């Protein structure tokens, strides 16, 4: 999938698209860590800091927001950083969505991804306040973990969990894996379903 998406992104001439041109970033989005010399947290962290030219410890959120912004530029109209809504500062806004980006590395242990479903509760009033659907965009390890816990479609999404996801959607809150958004970007001639 990563190689086909990279071929597609090479056809885009928009100068605002830069992070998605990095083939290793695209591999990382899809969970392909073959570009790391060793599959260790320290190597993933060093790579992420290098991509952002950011020596500070925290990098995945910033990289995820950059990826999310570029994908939104390709998918939606009028992408911008939204004004603060009451006490909330969401990551992105388009003509139809308020977007909160959730990103996680692949080689970090812990329970951070288990908190992603709570984002829907935290921002439950955003659709009413803005008239726009809240889209919670799960990127990289956050997407993988959201599939494993049943928040996104996959074998772990039981009937009961699907009911919760449906309830969120009925209330203008949707969880979306970045890989699904990337599929929507590509021409049908680049069908990725067989990869």
Report residues per predicted region.
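Hydrophobic, Leu/Ile/Phe/Ala-enriched alpha-helical segments that form helix-helix packing faces
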Residues: 68-76, 123-130, 168
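Short secondary-structure junctions
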Residues: 75-83
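Beta-rich catalytic cores
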Residues: 88
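Catalytic cores of nucleic-acid endonucleases
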Residues: 103-156
């Amino acid at each position: 999938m990563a190689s086909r998406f990279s071929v597609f992104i090479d056809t885009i001439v928009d100068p605002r698209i830069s992070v998605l041109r990095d083939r290793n970033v695209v591999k990382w989005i899809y969970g392909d860590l073959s570009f790391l010399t060793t599959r260790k947290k320290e190597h993933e962290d060093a790579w992420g800091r290098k991509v952002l030219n950011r020596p500070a410890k925290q990098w995945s959120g910033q990289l995820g927001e950059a990826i999310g912004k570029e994908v939104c530029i390709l998918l939606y109209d009028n992408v911008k950083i939204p004004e603060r809504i009451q006490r909330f500062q969401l990551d992105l806004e388009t003509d139809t969505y308020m977007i909160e980006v959730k990103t996680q590395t692949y080689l970090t242990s812990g329970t951070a991804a288990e908190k992603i479903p709570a984002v829907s509760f935290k921002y439950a009033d955003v659709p009413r306040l803005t008239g726009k659907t809240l889209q919670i965009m799960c990127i990289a390890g956050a997407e993988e973990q959201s599939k494993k816990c049943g928040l996104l479609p996959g074998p772990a999404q039981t009937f009961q969990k699907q009911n919760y996801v449906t309830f969120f959607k009925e209330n203008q809150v949707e969880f979306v894996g970045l890989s699904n958004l990337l599929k929507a970007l590509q021409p049908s001639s680049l069908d990725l379903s067989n990869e």
